[in-house]
Design a protein with these regions (language model features):
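Boundary at the C-terminal end of the N-terminal hydrophobic targeting segment
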Residues: 36-38
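N-terminal secretory signal peptides that target proteins for export/translocation
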Residues: 1-19
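Intrinsically disordered and other compositionally biased segments
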Residues: 10-11, 28-29, 98
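Position-driven detector of the extreme protein N-terminus
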Residues: 2, 33, 191-192
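Bacterial N-terminal signal peptides
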Residues: 19-34
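PEST-like low-complexity, intrinsically disordered acidic/proline/serine-rich tracts
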Residues: 43-68, 72-392
Length: 392
């Protein structure tokens, strides 16, 4: 870590005292909207209970959906207590230049974070200082990553189709603190402008990690109200299962891969390493579709826009807490801006069982700053572990 040039977003070239940094982060996180906590993993942790611990690193699990650092801490009685502190997903850490090698077994670690609501031996890691290295925040960019070679390749395939193959990811969203003390998730490129007040939090584009505005049916509203966000039974991602082809595309900054293979397009979702196939040689869906998470997709090119029609879904969750039935129908339109290399996806979903109207949204991904990796999902939080809560 000490060989890396760390770009600090709060004060360039100055390391704030540990207590001052703690106070700043606590104030900002307390001011964040509740939805941001739900998406950012703080629901199981008490943001009103900051903790500061010093211990010896014993293990690091670099996995999705969350990585975990394990430390041995001496308590007030001199007894050794084993603790685990939750960090970001391995995919996000690697995108930020972090590595497993940073966490040297046997090294001393000073950690600032938040206490777990139920487990006294768990914490949410917000800042860390390992040995004599610099103190870093969980969202800090340790290396300036360059985007993949997607920007320097032919715009079209030999067939004439637009070339959208490659590894794609949403710009990283991290916590920024506005001058008035409010905090929220913002694109990494906007951190400085938000923290200086040049850009208001209200003008920041949403991450798209939650449900889109939609009028629900009586059944849809009732089931959304009863949805338990932190229950593996209700929330698929807590049991290492995909949520939906819409939600999983950008949630948590996953790196996805698109591969054009003539009569089909294969999409590998990086969040939980699931594959989806778009059939280009079919005018209609078959009648005997086996319902699944991804459904059955057929695509066609309208000029340079890829239009994808998908049906055949198994009942599930389109975006927590909104559920969908087997009648869900999604139409996506993928378009590429060759100047900015932004791959935009506009989508419209209908489901007469759960939606009164249309479920409409869009998202944007860019050439990824790290390659796609088929990370296994390994949910290590004890409260989520069940018979099928991890998938290798």
């Amino acid at each position: 870590v000490d060989r890396l040039e760390i770009t600090r977003r709060r004060a360039a070239g100055h390391q704030a005292p540990f207590s001052h940094a703690a106070a700043t982060i606590v104030a900002a996180i307390l001011a964040m909207p509740a939805a941001s906590f739900a998406h950012h993993g703080l629901g199981r942790f008490d943001r009103s209970q900051p903790v500061e611990i010093t211990g010896t690193i014993t293990r690091i699990d670099f996995v999705n959906p969350h990585s975990y650092l394990y430390v041995d801490v001496a308590d007030a009685n001199g007894e050794t207590r084993a603790m685990r502190c939750e960090m970001r997903a391995a995919t996000l850490l690697r995108r930020s230049g972090w590595s497993e090698e940073m966490f040297v077994i046997g090294a001393e670690a000073q950690i600032f974070g938040f206490a777990h609501r139920d487990d006294p031996n768990a914490c949410y890691l917000e800042d860390i200082k390992i040995g004599d290295t610099l103190q870093i925040n969980r969202n800090d960019q340790l290396e300036q990553r360059t985007t993949s070679e997607l920007r320097n390749r032919p715009l079209r395939l030999a067939s004439g189709e637009l070339n959208i193959s490659g590894d794609w990811a949403q710009e990283q969203y991290v916590i920024a603190v506005a001058p008035d003390g409010r905090g929220n998730l913002v694109p990494k490129s906007m951190i400085a402008a938000v923290e200086s007040g040049e850009i208001a939090l209200e003008d920041v584009p949403p991450a798209g990690w939650g449900p889109r505005p939609v009028t629900l049916t009586a059944r849809g509203q009732s089931e959304a109200d009863a949805f338990r966000m932190w229950s593996p039974e209700d929330n698929p991602r807590l049991r290492c299962q995909p949520t939906s082809i819409l939600f999983d595309w950008v949630f948590d900054g996953a790196v996805n891969r698109i591969t054009q293979k003539g009569d089909r397009i294969v999409i590998n979702y990086g969040l939980y390493s699931f594959e989806r196939v778009i059939h280009l040689n079919m005018d209609a869906h078959p009648e005997d579709i086996e319902p699944s998470y991804a459904g059955h997709s057929i695509g066609r090119w309208e000029g340079d826009v890829l239009v994808v029609d998908t049906i055949g879904f198994a009942p599930g969750v389109i975006a927590p807490p909104v559920r969908h039935s087997g009648e869900l129908h999604i139409v996506e339109r993928f378009s590429l801006n060759p100047e900015t290399m932004e791959l935009r996806r506009d989508y419209v979903a209908t489901d007469p069982v759960y939606f009164e109207g249309e479920y409409v949204g869009y998202d944007i991904v860019l050439p990824s700053d790290v390659p796609y990796v088929a990370h296994p999902c390994n949910e290590l939080a004890p409260e989520f572990i069940s018979e099928d809560a991890s998938r290798e």
